[in-house]
Amino acid sequence: PNSKRYDGTPGTGGMGYSLSGRSASALPKPTYNSNKQGKVVVRIWVDREGNVVKAEPGYKGTTATDEGLRRKAKEAAMQAKFTPSKDAPELQVGTITYDFRTFN
């Protein structure tokens, strides 16, 4: 089943992921110093060792149009690490969602 885990607190950027049968062993938060807001869904491709080998921001559900937020989300997604699975497909596709929020 699809696993969704959430981390973060409002104002610092919430995160969640979906990658069937895998747990996140590292899910870095993006660093950003901006008042821009929105959600960026990054489509990820993960190898059997748990490494993210490809990431494309702007997947279905993305609300942020700012390219800076999308770039930061992609950078963080490429650093994510998931549990290895020898039974997984050679490349398993999932998503990581980053919610960039600020409060004035």
Tell what function each PLM region has:
Residues 1-33, 71-79:
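Acidic, low-complexity proline/glycine/alanine-rich linker and hinge segments
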